[in-house]
Structures are given as C-alpha cells and as structure tokens.
A protein has these predicted regions:
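Flexible, membrane-associating and regulatory peripheral segments of lipid-active enzymes
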Residues: 1-38, 43-55, 61-64, 239-250
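Proteins with a high burden of low-complexity, intrinsically disordered sequence enriched in S/T/G/P/A and R
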Residues: 8-25, 92-100, 104, 114-118, ...
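Serine-dependent carboxylesterase/thioesterase catalytic core
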Residues: 34-40, 47, 51, 55-67, ...
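Helical cap/lid subdomain of alpha/beta-hydrolase-fold lipid enzymes
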Residues: 112-250
C-alpha cells in the first residue's frame, strides 16, 4: 500500500532576495523570457506538469518538461544528469527551473553537484521532499524489496539527502519552496523548507487552500505564485486579500 501511494502521488525565515521586487527578472538581456525547464517527480510523469507548462507557453515562455531515466524511480543522480543535458540544450544563457516533488530533489542535485547553480536564475520547488518523506521511510522499513532506488534516496537521513543538504541553497539562483499543509505524500509537509530559500506554505497566504500533493502543479494559487516568482516580483506581505488576484493570474 505504501509503495502504491509513493509511486502514484510523488510523480524559517524568508530571504530578502524574493522579499522585494528585483532587477533580476525572468528575462534575457535582449528582453526575451528565460527558458523554463520543468522536472517531474517520482514516477516520471510529464503529464503531471503539462497544465503548468502549457500556461507558461501561453505567456510566451519556452518551457519544456524533461524525461527522466528509469521512469523517475531510479537513481536521482542519473535524473540530475539528464536535467543537466536538457539545460545545455536550451543554449548558453541562464534558465529557470521548476521541480515538482522528487523533481525538486533532482533539481537540487543538479544545482549543488553538477554546477547548475551557475546556469540558473530562479528555482521553484513544489512539494519537494527536501529532507525526505515518512512515506519513503516506511517503505524502506516494511517493503524494502519494493522500494526502488529513488524511494530509498527519499527516506529521511539518506546519504543522498545528507549530501545535498550540506548547502541547501548554493549561491547563484533565487530559491522558492512552496508546499501545502494538506500534503499526504511528502510528510511532514514542511520537510520542503530550505535554509536560504523563500519558504511558503500555501495556507499561510490562503487559509482556504485545500490543495493536495498531486494537485500542486495544477492549482491556480500555485501557478499564480510561480508566475510572480519567475517575473522576479515580490512575494513578501502576500495574504488572504491577494488570493483572488493570484488565482486569476493563472
């Protein structure tokens, strides 16, 4: 049961970099928009990110969701290498990254171990198990034979997570980590919190948000926050009065 949940569903203090409007927006020197590379989660389903990707494209942003090896259940470092290849294919300039669920961990491996921090402007993580998830921990304990490589790597205290959490936000990009208090897969939900990132629980802005883990990439509030972040807009001071505007932006 635990493995089924994992395979289906996993497909602090804010820093000032996103606390105020910035000159470092999601645009190239020539005024064009930076390409966005999206990284799917455990299970590797690109369909889970299609609505968000299509929204970005409608706004004139070149957006691509990568295919990860091993259906997203294999070695997350191999997925990070696939991400590095995808970024190189966008050309020599900077890019923005969006990592959903385990895809957020893949993005962080690329940033911290493969030199990606030098190429990336904005990093947006959606429900990322940055410090592991209890679901994976239980799977390792009780269903080890069914727990794929990525599953073991997502257990709290894994060697991989310990390695990338030595420096949770390597210098270079701006980091935004979003999560929902209603997350039933990445538990506890605030395992998504990162030192040096702008950390946002959806319900801290919109208490009525009932977004689950699987709904994060399709949620209108999440999309509104992602769009604002990629534009380099301020996220400080957002509250319940901004919910309608954020959702309408999607």
């Amino acid at each position: 049961m635990l493995i089924a949940v994992l395979a289906v569903a996993i497909v602090a203090v804010p820093v000032v970099r996103w606390a105020a409007a910035r000159d470092t927006t999601g645009r190239r020197v020539d005024g064009g928009r930076l390409p966005v590379v999206l990284v799917p989660g455990y299970g590797g389903s690109r369909a889970s990110l299609e609505q968000l990707r299509a929204t970005l494209v409608r706004r004139g942003i070149q957006a691509r969701t990568i295919a990860v090896p091993g259906n997203g259940t294999g070695d997350l470092r191999a997925s990070a290498r696939a991400l590095a290849t995808a970024v190189e294919r966008t050309g020599p300039g900077p890019v923005d990254l969006i990592g959903y669920s385990a895809g957020g961990v893949v993005a962080r491996i690329y940033l911290g171990e493969l030199g990606g921090a030098a190429r990336v402007r904005h990093v947006v993580l959606l429900g990322a198990p940055n410090h592991g998830t209890k679901v994976a921990e239980l799977a390792v304990q009780f269903r080890a034979a069914e727990c794929a490589v990525a599953c073991t790597q997502l257990a709290p205290g894994s060697a991989l997570l310990d390695a990338i959490n030595g420096d949770e936000t390597p210098d270079g990009p701006d980091y935004l980590s979003l999560w929902t208090a209603k997350d039933e897969t990445v538990t506890p939900p605030d395992t998504a919190r990162l030192d040096g990132a702008y950390n946002v629980e959806l319900q801290s802005i919109c208490p009525d948000a009932a977004t689950t883990h699987g709904e994060l990439p399709r949620d209108r509030l999440v999309t509104g926050l992602v769009l604002r972040a990629l534009d380099g807009g301020t996220l400080e001071g957002l509250g319940e009065g901004d919910c309608a505007t954020l959702r309408a932006a999607a």
